[in-house]
């Protein structure tokens, strides 16, 4: 129920008296002709309404959240605490660099941390989300080729196991998408790659480990082939949480990458709030990095603008990135240090392999049974679909009833009826075992009463929604009657 539906018409809203301003310069077509529709609720009722709504949310603070390819790890409260210090929180975007030296030093150190972690030589913190970072990375690849007058290079190679944003980003940058298949063992089909490489190749976009949850074993071969063809390698940092301190994209041969700080560096996810997707490059692309960046001159930290970066692709936003998120990431990195970040990846990988082994032990089908999981893995429920008529969606809806957020469903698309499961390093054995037991119980229900699963969830404010109607009759703006 939305708060407007609780209106009883008895509590007229009151406002503190204020001096009326001059509205004579406001165009008449912008003036109200009738009173606004307000909920007419007392302050206590409003507080209770939204508090109760918040308790119905699934979030990391309340539930196990094994959403594959999303790295829903715990957001440490210390990072929130220190990022909320007045010196950070009250900094105005127009404040002079001289007056915010502490903030700039933190950002400068974060740039250096990302360089060390990824094996790159240049970093920009300007992108305000992972998708924007991805756009910046491909835009730099395009700018690189155009500077060399290689205007015919307008193709980006994207494996079928890539993130869905990869082909979208290439399209937005005006490039053509060339898809290549993944083999049954989870590695890229090298023969298929050979067939599409050529004078039109601008680059290839990869995630390593890939979205099928395994490490691409032929990455050195792929890098050599793409570079020999004149293309560049783009690293989607979605799965960087699996390899911190163990392997670096720059050492693998990648030329540019973006990081998702809400994944790898534990900054808050979603909610429509601010994101951050820094980009890192090798020497080939440093001159194209988006601005602003933080530099150091005569022991003072400064903003580097367009005049300071010769062939920058320019600004991505009006100001200087989402500083509050970047500060949280800096604090996270400082708290863990190099050894701690490495340990985080080790435990994330250990947890994923533990869950994969346990689910296999319980009789579930692993999509790539002969491969070790990275930080995530895929279960295919195709046998359950064929034997009992239940789908991955049915399992997911029933998991919610059991107090566990569902894993990612039907992604990647090349595995039928799949769940992509990522426990992250911040979960313990008890929470993972609770999930495994829930999966076993749901399968038992599927054997005895598959129709019951078709009706899940039963314990939430809303039951199974009509996905087809929602897609065909999209209505995202609610208005009171």
Swiss-Prot record:
InterPro entries: GcvPB, GDC-P_C, GDC-P_N, GDC_P, PyrdxlP-dep_Trfase, PyrdxlP-dep_Trfase_major, PyrdxlP-dep_Trfase_small
Cofactor dependency: pyridoxal 5'-phosphate
Catalytic activity, as annotated: N(6)-[(R)-lipoyl]-L-lysyl-[glycine-cleavage complex H protein] + glycine + H(+) = N(6)-[(R)-S(8)-aminomethyldihydrolipoyl]-L-lysyl-[glycine-cleavage complex H protein] + CO2
Keyword Coiled coil: no
Region (Disordered): 1-26
SUPFAM superfamilies noted in UniProt: PLP-dependent transferases
Gene Ontology process terms (BP): glycine decarboxylation via glycine cleavage system
GO MF term set: glycine binding; glycine dehydrogenase (decarboxylating) activity; pyridoxal phosphate binding
Enzyme Commission no: 1.4.4.2
Residues carrying N6-(pyridoxal phosphate)lysine: 263
Family membership: Belongs to the GcvP family. C-terminal subunit subfamily.
Function of the molecule: The glycine cleavage system catalyzes the degradation of glycine. The P protein binds the alpha-amino group of glycine through its pyridoxal phosphate cofactor; CO(2) is released and the remaining methylamine moiety is then transferred to the lipoamide cofactor of the H protein.
Name of the protein this chain belongs to: Probable glycine dehydrogenase (decarboxylating) subunit 2
Organism: Francisella tularensis subsp. tularensis (strain WY96-3418)
Name of encoding gene: gcvPB
């Amino acid at each position: 129920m939305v708060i407007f539906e609780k209106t009883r018409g008895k509590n007229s809203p009151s406002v503190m008296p204020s001096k009326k301003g001059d509205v004579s310069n406001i165009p008449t077509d912008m003036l109200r002709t009738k009173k606004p529709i307000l909920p007419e609720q007392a302050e206590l009722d409003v507080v209770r309404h939204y508090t109760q709504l918040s308790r119905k949310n699934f979030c990391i603070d309340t539930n196990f959240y094994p959403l594959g390819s999303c790295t829903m790890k715990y957001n440490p409260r210390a990072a929130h605490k220190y990022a909320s210090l007045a010196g950070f929180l009250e900094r105005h975007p127009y404040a002079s660099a001289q007056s915010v030296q502490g903030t700039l030093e933190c950002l400068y150190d974060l740039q250096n941390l990302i360089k060390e972690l990824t094996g790159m030589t240049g970093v920009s913190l300007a992108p305000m989300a992972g998708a924007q970072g991805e756009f910046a990375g491909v835009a730099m690849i395009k700018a690189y080729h155009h500077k060399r007058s290689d205007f015919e290079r307008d193709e980006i190679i994207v494996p079928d196991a890539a993130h869905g944003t990869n082909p979208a980003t290439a399209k937005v940058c005006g490039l053509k998408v060339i898809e290549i298949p993944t083999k049954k063992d989870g590695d890229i089909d090298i023969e298929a790659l050979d067939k599409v490489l050529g004078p039109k190749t601008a680059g290839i976009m990869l995630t390593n480990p890939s979205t099928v949850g395994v490490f691409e074993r032929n990455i050195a071969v792929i890098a050599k082939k793409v570079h020999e063809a004149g293309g560049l390698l783009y690293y989607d940092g979605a799965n960087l949480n699996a390899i911190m301190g163990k392997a670096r994209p720059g050492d693998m041969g990648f030329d540019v990458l973006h990081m998702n700080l809400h994944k790898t560096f534990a900054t808050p996810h979603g909610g429509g709030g601010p994101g951050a997707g820094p980009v890192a490059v090798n020497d080939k692309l440093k001159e194209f990095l988006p601005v602003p960046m933080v530099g150091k001159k005569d022991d003072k930290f400064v903003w580097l603008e367009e005049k300071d970066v010769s062939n920058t692709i320019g600004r991505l936003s009006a100001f200087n990135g989402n500083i509050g998120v970047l500060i949280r990431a800096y604090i996270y990195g400082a708290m863990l240090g190099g050894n701690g970040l490495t340990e985080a990846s080790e435990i994330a990988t250990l947890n994923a392999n533990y869950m994969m082994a346990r689910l296999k032990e319980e009789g579930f089908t692993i999509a790539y049974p002969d491969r070790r999981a990275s930080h995530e893995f895929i279960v295919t429920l195709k046998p359950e679909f064929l034997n009992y008529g239940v789908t991955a969606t049915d399992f997911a809806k029933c998991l919610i009833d059991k107090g566990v957020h569902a894993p990612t469903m039907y992604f990647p698309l090349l595995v039928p009826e799949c769940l992509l499961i990522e426990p992250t390093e911040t979960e313990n054995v008890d929470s993972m075992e609770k999930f495994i037991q829930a999966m076993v119980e749901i399968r038992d229900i599927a054997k005895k009463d598959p129709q019951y699963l078709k009706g899940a969830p039963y314990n939430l404010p809303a039951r199974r929604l009509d996905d087809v109607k929602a897609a065909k009759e999209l209505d995202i703006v609610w208005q009171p009657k």
